[in-house]
Amino acid sequence: MVRVRFAPSPTGHLHVGGARTALFNWMFARKEGGKFILRIEDTDTERSSREYEQQILESLRWCGLDWDEGPDIGGDFGPYRQSERLEIYREYAKKLVEDKRAYYVVYDKEDPSKELFTTYDYPHEYKEKGHPVTIKFKVLPGKTSFEDLLKGYMEFDNSTLEDFIIMKSNGFPTYNFAVVVDDHLMRISHVFRGEDHLSNTPKQLMIYEAFGWEAPVFMHIPLILGPDRTPLSKRHGATSVEHFRREGILSRALMNYLALLGWRVEGDEIFTIEEKLQSFDPKDISNKGVIFDYQKLEWVNGKHMRRIDLEDLKREFIEWAKYVGREIPSLNESYFTEALRICREKVNTLSQLYDIMYPFMSDDYEYEKDYVEKFLKREEAERVLEEAKKAFKDLNSWNMEEIEKTLRDLSEKGLASKKVVFQLIRGAVTGKLVTPGLFETIEVLGKERTLKRLERTLQFLKKT
């Protein structure tokens, strides 16, 4: 059976690179009818925290990447936190020493970087006197090779590696040792991970060989890069799933975009993961690094916002607003839906949607500075607004065609140019100069709300 794992370290928020790795593992497991395991690698006691662990789990859930075994739900091969598996690592390290494939190293008390001697016998006396003791793995002469699913045949000369620590003096395992023990005991069949782990692979394969265990199939995925073609990091800007969630990126759009980063997809590049799941083949992943393009992500998100059902968008919008602490007032359902329908055409994120929707959700909007300076302060502004109020008041049929005719008739009276008339009205009823189409905006706002807002703007004008 296919068994893959995603094994983050809880030292920060989930990075988009980690999310993409999790996605590729998840897709492979789901397509093959296998298991997706979540393991927490928290042996870095100084930097790891349960708070970050919970945030990572929450980000994965939001991404729609559910797991079959993990720290929160258990499973047949737990525990699923490395910090809860210390005795397991110690026992297996001891076995390597017994087989003379590893040995103890005793260090100077005053200078812990200075090795005093090595031994196959546990140095009780020195340990009791406070000497640091580690266990090192013995690198044998020869070559280590494996077939990478993406990169093909890989070979390493063992002479380039020195004996390396597998158990630290604090009793915790090093990464390369713990990951081998865990992957073997959890029966992991495939390891898909970033190519930054490629240099770890020969060490891990040596440990597999020393135990006489079969190694999993490895695939090392090229990293996500910043615009300068260096690995994507905080210096390039936001890199966490949490950030993009708060910015108003839909989870389906983020997964869509991350899948596009390296996976050669046939057909339309706007899709849900479920739509492309059966066509996923890890061998279709590119062997070249890919640049993370924030603008492309927003574009993909905008496509999804206009692609999904309005009710789904409404639910996503309300959930997002609650998550980031933005208020959405209780509004008439059909009015809210219509406002959402016209506003989603102009924006690419839920955050932008909130800003453009605000005048539809609240009468207490502010007037943009440009609107006040460029239009409201014009000497003809008051007359245009008064005439518009009168014309709308007399309007019997409140629809887009009649609203357009009314405004065009008004602009032909010679009070101001058509642009000035339209922008004066637009800003009066929304406070903004960029909105959905003016005629449909006024239609959705309705007659009563439009008249009140024209009057509100006239009062504001008189005060300034």
Curated annotation (Swiss-Prot):
User: What PROSITE patterns does the database record attribute to this sequence?
Assistant: AA_TRNA_LIGASE_I
Where, per UniProt, does this protein localize? Cytoplasm
Where ATP binds, per the record, is at K234
**Motif 'KMSKS' region positions after renumbering to this chain:** 231-235
The enzyme's E.C. designation: 6.1.1.17
**Where, by residue number, is the motif 'HIGH' region?**
8-18
Top-level taxonomic group: Bacteria
GO MF entry, a single one: zinc ion binding
Q: Which Pfam families match?
A: Anticodon_2 (PF19269), tRNA-synt_1c (PF00749)
- Cited CDD domains: GluRS_core (cd00808)
Q: Mind telling me which GO cellular component terms the entry cites?
A: cytosol
**Catalytic activity annotated for this protein?**
tRNA(Glu) + L-glutamate + ATP = L-glutamyl-tRNA(Glu) + AMP + diphosphate
| Keyword field | Aminoacyl-tRNA synthetase, ATP-binding, Cytoplasm, Ligase, Nucleotide-binding, Protein biosynthesis
The answer on whether this UniProt entry bears the keyword Zinc-finger reads no
Keyword Nucleotide-binding among record annotations: yes
Q: Which GO terms describe its biological process?
A: glutamyl-tRNA aminoacylation
Q: How does it assemble?
A: Monomer.
What is known about what this protein does? Catalyzes the attachment of glutamate to tRNA(Glu) in a two-step reaction: glutamate is first activated by ATP to form Glu-AMP and then transferred to the acceptor end of tRNA(Glu).
According to its UniProt record, which protein family does this protein belong to?
A: Belongs to the class-I aminoacyl-tRNA synthetase family. Glutamate--tRNA ligase type 1 subfamily.
Name of the protein described by the UniProt record: Glutamate--tRNA ligase 1
Q: Which organism is it from?
A: Thermotoga sp. (strain RQ2)
| Lineage, uppermost ranks | Bacteria, Thermotogati, Thermotogota, Thermotogae, Thermotogales
